[in-house]
Amino acid sequence: MFYWLLKWIAIGPVLRILFRPVVEGADHVPEEGPAILASNHLSYADWLFMPLTLARRVTFVAKAEYFTTPGIKGWFQKKFFSGSGQVPIDRSGASAAEGALSAAKRILDQGELFGIYPEGTRSHDGRLYRGKTGVARLALETGVPVIPVAVLGTDVVSPPGKKFGTFTRPGVRFGPPLDLRKGLGP
């Protein structure tokens, strides 16, 4: 409920009016059924603009610190991320992240969209970092297609390490779905 309130009433309309994001390839995202949206990660704004361009809900993994930070800021972060249905991920190592992958499987089993940043962190210089194996493992274990997503310009809207950015039109490009099981032997 909180997710839809944010997307269609509170934050979404403001972002659509102020930034007018450019969208390409949204038809590659299925109208129903599960899919993994694997995106680059340029800024905090990525997880706002990508779902904003789709009619369906997108659930993301978010670093566990957003759910455990002490103080008033931490309380607001926890309420916001929990209320919007995001999944905490412990990024300290592969075994620590298993809980998030299990949660992702449950989300995909329910026929939902799951968003993930294969790099595991935001890029501070705009370059694409080496991806982690979680996306491939998730796709192979579930048989769900991976839709590559390029989010563009959010590093200008919300630059890493700065409080304010520039008003520009961010872009979101969805690529055709990939079946990672193709080409694998029996």
PLM regions and their residue ranges:
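Hydrophobic/aromatic ligand-binding patch that stacks against planar heteroaromatic rings
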Residues: F49-M50, F80, R106, R137-E141
